UniProtKB/Swiss-Prot annotation:
The lineage of its organism: Eukaryota, Fungi, Dikarya, Ascomycota, Saccharomycotina. It is a multi-pass membrane protein. It is found in: Membrane. Keywords: Glycoprotein, Membrane, Peptide transport, Protein transport, Transmembrane, Transmembrane helix, Transport. This is Oligopeptide transporter 2. The keyword Transmembrane helix applies. It comes from the Eukaryota. GO terms for molecular function: oligopeptide transmembrane transporter activity. NCBIfam families: ISP4_OPT (TIGR00727), OPT_sfam (TIGR00728).
Length: 877
């Protein structure tokens, strides 16, 4: 064995496999080591390497199969002194405190190693401890402390790799036009299908490789500048990711199509294309402005993990990454293997054997038993079933291969509590809900029929009190009641929890914004804002931020200009067109997003979970603008899409940060794509309205019944025409108490976490209530139970006991299955479902037979004395 480790020696000693001792100075040693990175036995003892791999979780790796990330960490380790390493670990203990995504045993090991600095003499530090101190510090300094990041992200960058090329733009624009049009067209169908980002990544890879090989390297001169339609280089990883991110920005919700559909088809308001374009332009771009503010909180910091972006990076690495020879199948082969497996398998649950989709086997025992169907049914019941589905479309509903296990488990526990509350609400017959099915998302009348909102509106699409009094108030199923209650709880919970737990971060953020706005009084501040040498990353020292310092950052004023420009366009729309929408309503939406954006985006960046502000905007504006459904819809579009588009854009910024895509190139490209997307989506939408017979009607032959638009319309009537005052004060008074319940939960857990002696490390009340919110009709426990099993296997068992396999294949598996599923669904739709060629046999009909398939209420409305429940006609609130 080697001698005692000496202080201030970069790598104090090297024990070869023969036992001879060698010493080296840092730079020379690092160069020699980089030339032999595949044979670390020349520079470290076998025991040291195996010991460190075990510390990182690689239980089954050998010296002949060292993971790429470990090899890189060991390669960079000579650049750190022992003092440097101690400082890095001490800073990391503070920075990553309470970070659930850092393995607990790893964090405790950091603390143990840092405590060794207090020894009287550094010579008393054990050889292995000294090695671990440098190795862990090297992982943090030169790579990442997160296993998820090390699995798919390359720590180094080559700035000479082409990114913003003509071919990358051309392919991105073509596929964005195809994808946006396709997704818009089929988004209004009952069973919608879409071209998601993974499938487009595969198409981009095929097209990019073909372009590089077949298109001549000609140049085009524009205003004296030459542009090559092809370059004499292979299709690169950065071009692939750049094109992917341009497509990804148009995968966010094109929210204004709900406004246009409801106003044209349900409110019969003939607004011009100019109105549609300007409204869409304002709504789609206003979120970009907020994204610039969010960068320093959820893009640049290393703690902003963004687990949901890992599959996108994994596909890129699998398709174009250079893999070193390792045991087992390559990522490239594994991706296409999983793609073909899922492409074939998806035919069975989707078309051939539907019981694989909805495996409600317990209801088959007695199909007519309503109670059994209510509790265990997967169609209209709560889905309490340990083996509920074998369909990857259902299993992957909540991304079990992507969300951290602690995040998925917390959400699942929230789902279980929500199911128990639904049972309590239903079987206690709260507000006579037993006269309705237990778990549906429809609105009902007091006679148990579907609530038709047109029955209570006048010719101006406002509430007609006489019609309302002769018809019925709207009633919710028990499942919808609990879902709405959880949604209401989430808002005050988010505020109280965040301002207690993240008080310093939020205080500094709001202080920074206030000071910047106040500084705008001076000319010097405006000059500084327009400087070209914007250095936003100077305060960050992780490897990815350091690599990104090679590229110019997008100045704040670019985002500020888009925010102001979009707001001006929005004001012009609501003022010029007959929308009945006050300008101050836009500023209220901006204010709510200003308060909620940082907490909600931090939640998404660290846990993968997100929720929107749509219900909050509906309720607040319903109080402020009673009887004005058009205004509610417009303000809801702004209030929701600011958050939605900002989150979408900053997640793309984080991918660019990980993959070293120049920020200014991404900004330019995504602005161009969003502008094009507006024309494509509006063109497709207006064509559908004009050319598809019975479009958005319940009996449309091709099932283009617009379920989302109908829900949007119903919500505009309930919260806009009827109003939250009637709902909260009379029909469902429990809702108003949910605000207080949410605030109390946030205060209780916030105080406990910040000042309590012990707090469960992996418990986040926002995720728990978010899980309750997930349990929203028609998505019952069936959509989460099978995923819970997969999450345990992947994110817990495999990650803990087979980390080498998990790192190499987990996100590739997620991407391969997702890609195969989407392409298979498209083929199935056009081959058999579009022609309505049903495959009728027992395996396809039994899930929908009996009480679970129909959704019977527990009580029959005809058994009541008056033939209705609740308030008497003429006395409705």
């Amino acid at each position: 064995m080697s001698e005692t480790v000496k202080d201030k020696v970069i790598i104090d000693e090297k024990v070869s496999t023969k036992g001879t001792v060698d010493y080296a100075e840092g730079a020379e040693y690092s160069e020699r080591l980089s030339n032999h990175s595949s044979d670390f036995s020349q520079w470290y003892t076998d025991e040291q390497i195996l010991h460190f791999m075990k510390k990182l979780g690689y239980e089954n790796r050998t010296l002949y199969d060292i993971p790429e990330d470990v090899a890189y960490i060991l390669k960079k380790m000579p650049e750190l002194t022992l003092e440097d390493s101690f400082k890095i670990l001490k800073d990391s203990i503070i920075y990553f405190k309470d970070d659930e995504n850092i393995p607990h045993d790893q964090y405790e090991e950091w603390k143990r190693l840092v405590d060794l600095e207090d020894l009287d003499s550094k010579e008393g530090i054990d050889e292995y401890d000294s090695f671990d101190i440098r190795a862990f510090a090297s992982a943090i300094k030169f790579h990442s402390p997160y296993q998820e990041v090390r699995a798919v992200v390359d720590p180094e960058d080559d700035p000479t790799i082409p990114v913003e090329t003509f071919r990358a733009y051309f392919l991105a624009i073509i596929w964005s036009v195809i994808g946006s049009g396709f997704n818009e067209f089929f988004s209004h169908r009952v069973v919608s299908i879409s071209l998601n980002t993974p499938i487009i990544q595969m198409f981009l890879y095929i097209c990019g490789k073909a372009w590089a090989k077949t298109i001549p390297c000609w140049t085009i001169t524009i205003r004296g500048r030459k542009y090559g339609i092809n370059i004499d280089k292979p299709w690169t990883q950065k071009e692939q990711m750049f094109s992917t991110l341009l497509y990804a920005i148009c995968q966010g919700a094109f929210y204004t199509h709900y406004n246009i559909l409801t106003q044209k088809l349900f409110y019969h308001s003939a607004f011009s294309f100019g109105y549609q374009f300007l409204l869409s332009l304002s709504v789609q771009f206003i979120g970009f402005g907020f994204a610039g503010i969010l960068r320093k909180f959820v893009v640049y910091p290393a703690r902003a993990l963004w687990p949901t972006v890992m599959p996108t990076i994994a596909i890129n690495k699998a398709l174009l990454g250079k893999e070193k020879h390792e045991s087992g199948m390559s990522r490239y082969k594994f991706f296409f293997l999983t793609f073909f497996i899922m492409f074939i398998y998806n035919w069975f649950p989707t078309y051939i054997i539907n019981i694989l989709n909805t495996f409600n086997w317990m209801t088959w025992i007695k199909p007519s038993n309503i109670n059994l169907a209510n509790i265990t049914g997967g169609v209209t019941g709560l889905g309490i079933n340990p083996i509920s589905s074998f369909d990857w479309n259902v299993i992957s509903f909540n991304s079990p291969l992507v969300y951290p296990f602690w995040s998925y488990l917390t959400q699942y526990l929230g789902c279980i509590l929500a199911a128990l509350i639904v049972i309590a609400v239903y079987y206690s017959n709260y507000m006579s809900c037993q006269y309705l099915p237990i778990f549906t998302n429809s609105l009902y009348t007091n006679t148990g029929h579907s609530f038709k909102v047109t029955e209570v509106l006048d010719s101006d699409n406002k509430l007609d009190v006489k019609k309302y009094q002769s018809y019925s108030p709207p009633y919710y199923s028990a499942g919808n009641l609990v879902s709405y209650g959880a949604f209401i709880c989430a808002y005050p919970l988010m505020i109280t929890w965040s301002f207690i737990v993240h008080s310093k971060l939020l205080f500094n953020a709001f202080k920074d914004w206030a000071l910047n706005l106040w500084a705008m009084r001076k000319l010097k501040s405006w000059v500084t804002m327009f400087k070209s040498d914007y250095r936003a990353l100077d305060d960050y020292d992780d490897p990815h931020s350091n690599a990104m310092k090679n590229y110019k950052e997008v100045p704040d004023w670019w985002y500020f200009a888009i925010l102001i420009g979009s707001l001006v366009v929005g004001i012009a729309v609501v003022e010029h067109y007959p929308t009945n929408t006050p300008v101050w309503g836009l500023f209220v939406c901006l204010g709510f997003n200003f308060v909620f954006l940082i907490p909600t985006t931090i939640l998404q960046a660290t846990t993968g979970y997100s929720f929107g502000l749509n219900l909050l905007i509906e309720m607040v504006m319903g109080y402020a603008l009673p009887g004005n459904p058009i205004a509610i819809m417009i303000l809801k579009a702004f209030g929701y899409n600011i958050d939605g588009q900002a989150d979408n854009y900053v997640s793309n910024l984080k991918i660019a940060h990980y993959c070293k895509i120049p920020p200014m190139a991404l900004f330019r490209g995504q602005c161009v794509i969003v502008f094009i997307q507006i024309f494509v989506n509006l063109g497709v939408l207006n064509w559908q309205i004009s050319n598809i017979k019975d479009f958005c009607t319940p009996h449309q032959n091709a099932k283009f019944t617009c379920p989302d638009a109908v829900t949007y319309y119903n919500a505009s009537v309930v919260w806009g025409a009827i109003g939250p005052k009637r709902i909260f004060n009379y029909i469902y008074p429990i809702f108003k108490w949910c605000w207080l319940i949410g605030a109390c939960i946030g205060i209780f857990f916030g105080v406990w976490k910040r000042w309590g002696k012990f707090y469960p490390r992996y418990f986040d009340p926002m995720l728990f209530v978010g899980g309750m919110l997930n349990m929203s009709p028609p998505y019952n426990l069936m959509y989460y139970t099978s995923g819970m099993i997969v999450s345990y296997i992947s994110q817990y068992y495999m990650k803990r006991h087979h980390l080498n396999l998990w790192e190499k294949y987990n996100y590739v598996l997620s991407a391969g299955f997702s890609t195969g599923l989407v392409l298979s669904a498209i083929i199935i739709f056009f081959a058999v479902q579009y022609k309505d060629t049903a495959f009728n046999w027992w395996g396809n009909t039994v899930p929908y037979a009996g009480a679970d398939g129909v959704g019977y209420p527990l009580k029959n409305i005809t058994d009541t004395a008056n033939g209705y429940f609740g308030y008497a006609p003429g006395h409705y609130p």
